[in-house]
């Protein structure tokens, strides 16, 4: 089985999205599912201003992992009905052509699921998912049609993830896990 690439766009090391991504990564480890988690996307990845800029080391590490991954899970917070700039910046860096690879080669036909955690009720989450989903499709990713909104009370620990039927259903549909 290929590696599962987990990308968390949380706003701090202790953000809800990063916490949940770490819980899921630990769960996959226990199940023997090879995965890699990248978070803190706001750190060590400068904004892409010119496609001729030197590629950040963190992006080079992500490329290596994406090359051997077929499935991606993105944890994305919602702000003002959209997703954060550091997530798009990271995706833009990863979409650049390199070596013999063309634009978006790392993403081509890979399956991606989106999970969103919020402090409140998540009223803007659906619109944010639609915007992010459209962007992910532009990168040639196969976006799972259903996104997952997890409120603060639902993601305090690994057990909470396993009790969230929608998340488990999507992960099963992506053939990531079978519970």
Report residues per predicted region.
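N-terminal beta1-alpha1-beta2 submodule of the flavodoxin-like/Rossmannoid cofactor-binding fold
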Residues: 1-99, 143, 158-177
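Short, histidine-centered active-site or binding-site loop motifs used for metal coordination
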Residues: 8-10, 116-118, 153-154
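Residue-level detector of flexible, active-site-proximal loop/helix-junction positions
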Residues: 42-44, 119, 150
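Flexible, gly/pro- and Lys/Arg-enriched active-site loops
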Residues: 96-108
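Short, glycine-/small-residue-rich phosphate/pyrophosphate-handling segment
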Residues: 107-148
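Short helix/strand-capping connector loops at secondary-structure junctions
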Residues: 148-159
């Amino acid at each position: 089985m290929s590696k599962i690439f987990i990308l968390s766009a949380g706003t701090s090391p202790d953000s809800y999205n990063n916490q949940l991504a770490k819980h899921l990564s630990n769960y996959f480890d226990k199940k023997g599912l090879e995965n890699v988690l990248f978070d803190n996307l706001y750190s060590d990845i400068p904004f892409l201003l010119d496609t001729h800029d030197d590629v950040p080391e963190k992006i080079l590490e992500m490329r290596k992992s994406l090359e051997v991954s077929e499935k991606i899970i993105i944890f994305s917070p919602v702000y003002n009905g959209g997703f954060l700039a550091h997530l798009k910046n990271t995706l833009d860096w990863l979409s650049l052509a390199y070596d013999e690879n063309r634009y978006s080669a790392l993403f081509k036909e890979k399956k991606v699921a989106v999970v969103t955690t919020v402090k409140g009720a998540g009223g803007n989450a659906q619109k944010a998912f639609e915007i992010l989903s459209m962007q992910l499709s532009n990168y040639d990713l196969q976006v799972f049609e259903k996104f997952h909104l997890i409120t603060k009370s639902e993601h305090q620990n690994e057990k909470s993830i396993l009790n969230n039927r929608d998340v488990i259903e999507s992960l099963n549909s992506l053939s990531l896990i079978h519970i």
